[in-house]
Amino acid sequence: MAEEEEPKPPPLRRKSSANYRGYAVEPHAKRQSKISASRKLQLKTLLLQRAKRDLEREEQERAGEKQRHLGELCPPPELDGLGVAQLQELCRELHARIGRVDEERYDMGTRVSKNMAEMEELRLRVAGGRFVRPALRRVRLSADAMMAALLGSKHRVGTDLRAGLRQVRKDEAEKESREVGDWRKNVDALSGMEGRKKKFEAPGGGQS
């Protein structure tokens, strides 16, 4: 029985070919990982546990270093056998030490803030050189265009304050003022007091 011929791999395309779309890679068998998935998971778990223990140990060392430093700076006072005057002197000394520590803390915080501001300024300078800033032009916008840009095209806001006012002509205004000014005459005419008022206003009209 004749042996079957193995299939030949596809020919590699040249870069000068019109249908070339990428670098040609020779076909090869898929590599199998030497470590199984369960073994990988076990190794990751061990690494995470080791990192957790290291972090806990570093935190304990940092806390111990802090306590040691505080013990050197502020040793526990010895109060046995001290009188009132000695206790007062000790209190004044502690208050002075607290003031000095507070001043040092403020100075240190100021230096840290200044350094952070300088670092931020340098970062902005470095980032500013990477981009080309476009030239800004001054554009004059009307009040309606500005409100439309802020509120959107759906909201139409008019800035004409006289739009909602009532328009009154000059002759109508004079008529209304004349009617308002003659309200006493209208009241007298309606009440029948107009003739009597003239009678009393005439000279000697009220004498019989």
Curated annotation (Swiss-Prot):
Troponin I is the inhibitory subunit of troponin, the thin filament regulatory complex which confers calcium-sensitivity to striated muscle actomyosin ATPase activity. GO terms for cellular component: troponin complex. The modification N-acetylalanine is found at A2. This is Troponin I, cardiac muscle. It holds the Pfam family Troponin-I_N. Residues 54-71, 168-187 have a biased composition (Basic and acidic residues). Residues 28-73 are annotated as: Involved in binding TNC. The keyword Acetylation applies. InterPro entries: Troponin, Troponin-I_N, Troponin_I, Troponin_sf. Belongs to the troponin I family. It comes from the Eukaryota. GO terms for biological process: cardiac muscle contraction; skeletal muscle contraction. Keywords: Acetylation, Actin-binding, Muscle protein. Residues 1-37, 54-74, 168-208 are annotated as: Disordered. The gene is TNNI3. GO terms for molecular function: actin binding. Disulfide bonds: none annotated. Binds to actin and tropomyosin.
